[in-house]
């Protein structure tokens, strides 16, 4: 039975003009993951990832620290592991935040900007997942969930069932894949999502016709550094 190791990307550049780029801390998180994987004897024999820059940068940093692994031209790139459109989900809930600079202005009005964003974004996601407004979105929650599951299905059909595959992806995709494994209802599923840390490791065991959860959101590679600032969620 092989393992599919789902890795949430390192910390991205939240609040910057280009979110889809690892922050210096995100790069460090990914390197720590690679060093930990090497020390623990994990096999990074096959790598898959979504199409986002932060996915590729996370894989690059991780494998550099690991010191081995497949060449980048041999990685499996599949849009099934891409994140949902955060911006669209947000502005369908808060159209006033669609204008350039509007989100930054919104955050400056709060003494606790990260908390204010999380509260607003959680409400936006609840609207999206609730499926009462599916026609408002280019990709509804059911469509996103099916896209992620199809990506996992393609991966399982491509690799040997005894082979381990490391998949560098995003929190939403991991959440969608775990929903079918754990049978969590829609209205509860993003309670899991909010707990997923950057470069957290979720391991699935798979064989033909069966996928089961082995490890959820492990952050041992960060915890062993005894630096709380390494634990991030965006």
PLM region spans:
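Loop-to-helix element that buttresses phosphate recognition and phosphoryl-transfer chemistry
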Residues: 3-5, 10-65, 140-147
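A short beta-strand-loop-alpha-helix capping motif that often carries His-Thr
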Residues: 165-177
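Active-site metal-binding loops of divalent metal-dependent hydrolases
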Residues: 10, 171-172, 217
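A mid-sequence, solvent-exposed acidic-amphipathic segment
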Residues: 135-165
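General small-molecule cofactor/ligand-binding pocket signal
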Residues: 5, 76-78, 214
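Short glycine/proline- and acidic residue-enriched helix-loop micro-motifs
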Residues: 102-143
